[in-house]
């Protein structure tokens, strides 16, 4: 399986905007922004959440929300406020909010077929 990145822009509450290269990870629920990014766009923590990593380790991180723009869609999304050396990750919750799915075989994003049930 390959590694796929997408270029996007994130915007905070004061309309500060930053371009960011996001790793698309369909196994991760929430989008994560590194500390340098979320501080630059003035995001503020809204709550604490506990997360379990793939190795079983539990970590606590603060969560906020931002406006995200990708080539195929844009909207508000929850984001984990990462630490200094964390990588920017695009998670499934954001993809679903934007109505997108990731095809890991073609390494592309495409519109999802939504069900109204």
Where are these regions (language model features)?
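Pepsin/retropepsin-fold aspartyl endopeptidases
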Residues: 1-117
